[in-house]
C-alpha cells in the first residue's frame, strides 16, 4: 500500500488571519512567521532528508528546570530513540548564542544525536559527541541520523 502524499503549504483565511494546514499534526494552525519556518523545515526533513512523517513530533513537550517547554520538532528513530531536536525561529530572528543556549537546554533533556537550529535562511546543525556538540557542514539524512557515525 502506497502512502498518501502529504499536503504541504495549504493555507486559508479564517477569522481575519491566515491559517496553514500542518500535515504532521493534521490540523490547521496560525501562519505566524515562526510557523512558516517550522513548516518549511518539516517539509525539508520529510521530503528531502527522508525522515518518515510518523517519526516527527511537532511542538514536543518537555520540562527544562521544572518549567514546561516545547521543542519545535523532535525526530525519532525506529525504536523511539530521539535522533534530532529542531528549533525554529522567524526569518527576522538572528540565530544568536541565546537561541543556541535555548536549543542546548532542550538537547540536554531529550539527548538526541543531533541539534538543528534554523530561521529558514540559515541552518546550523550539530552532532552530539560525548558532552560536546560538533558543528556539521551539512544536514544529515534520516539514514545518516540512524547510524552512529557520520
Residue map of PLM features:
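A short, conserved, highly charged catalytic patch centered on acidic carboxylates
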Residues: 1-114, 121-150
Amino acid at each position: 500500500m502506497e502512502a498518501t502524499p502529504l499536503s504541504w503549504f495549504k493555507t486559508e483565511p479564517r477569522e481575519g488571519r491566515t491559517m496553514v494546514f500542518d500535515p504532521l499534526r493534521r490540523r490547521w494552525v496560525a501562519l505566524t512567521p515562526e510557523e512558516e519556518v517550522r513548516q518549511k523545515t518539516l517539509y525539508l526533513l520529510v521530503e528531502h532528508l527522508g525522515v518518515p512523517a510518523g517519526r516527527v513530533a511537532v511542538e514536543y513537550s518537555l520540562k527544562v528546570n521544572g518549567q514546561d517547554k516545547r521543542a519545535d520538532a523532535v525526530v525519532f528513530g525506529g525504536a523511539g530513540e530521539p535522533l534530532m531536536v529542531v528549533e525554529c525561529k522567524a526569518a527576522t530572528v538572528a540565530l544568536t548564542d541565546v537561541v543556541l543556549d535555548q536549543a542546548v537546554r532542550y538537547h540536554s533533556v531529550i539527548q538526541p544525536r543531533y541539534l538543528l537550529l534554523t530561521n529558514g535562511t540559515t541552518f546550523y546543525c550539530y552532532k552530539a559527541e560525548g558532552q560536546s556538540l560538533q558543528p556539521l557542514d551539512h544536514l544529515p539524512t534520516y539514514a545518516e541520523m540512524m547510524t552512529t557515525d557520520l
